[in-house]
Amino acid sequence: QDLLIDLNDVERRITPNTKAVIPIHYCGNPCDMDRLIKMSEKNDFKIIEDAAHAFGSIYKGCKIGSFGHATCFSFDPIKVITCGEGGAVVLKDNDIAEKIRRKRILGINKDAWHRYNNERSWFYDVTTTGYRYHMSNINAAIGLVQLSKLDQFIARRRWICQQYDNAFKGLGCIHPLKINYDDVSPFMYIVRVPGKQIEFRSFLEEKGIGTGVHYIANHVHSLFKKYTTKEMPRTEKLWQEIVTLPLHCGLSNNDVQTVIKNVLAFERTAS
């Protein structure tokens, strides 16, 4: 009903070899972190939260980013706030944080104090393998301005989601996910349209309304097919039902009503 990680299934699959579990706060809706933390403590695995959708979401009074051993956020162009491109990792372990800092810029270690004082400012050392993942000052500046508007963005997105929820309640072939938006920073608005995904998307496209599918299941992509050893019937079924409706702060009230009107029009023709 909410497409979050099935913790009953996780519990069945934990073995002594389990090193980490990666819950996804899908659409910005937090997973059951209390239960997952208990499982982590009992079975000695790390929790790496995929919070790409959930910047600003709250779970039981605390911001997402407060729970797992590591939490990953995304600030790409379509997220709740953007830096143009980029993201952030929030960690509880200072040693891991330092390793990530070095890896984000080619494994280079440069003492910040010496740079500030211009002592041997030319000197650096490569201490580990690394990547070019550091953010530019321009991207960071964009992000800081966006951050100052976060509450405004979240409020607008919640309002749109609530308009959709109210309009689509009790429909026969279109089913919104069951999400309480009071503490959620909504990234996407998803409906399930069993057996009519393609028809629904085509209908809205003809009306000038763009939609998406978030996401095509990983195991059906060419790269990952060879690693799929078991059937995943629920995943297979769900990705062919879900449709993403427009949700962003550029939508006017009239735009929202246009989406609602046309979704209801499809419901009448399809029921």
Predicted segments with their positions:
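Active-site PLP attachment segment
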Residues: 66-110
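PLP-dependent aminotransferase class I/II
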Residues: 6-8, 12, 20-24, 29, ...
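Conserved PLP phosphate-binding loop immediately N-terminal to the Schiff-base lysine helix
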Residues: 1-9, 20-36, 43-74, 80
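A secondary-structure boundary/capping signal
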Residues: 51, 74-77, 92, 146, ...
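Short Pro/Gly-enriched coil loops immediately N-terminal to beta-strands
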Residues: 64-68, 83, 136, 237-239
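Alpha-helix termination/capping residues and helix-transition junctions
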Residues: 15, 64-65, 81, 132
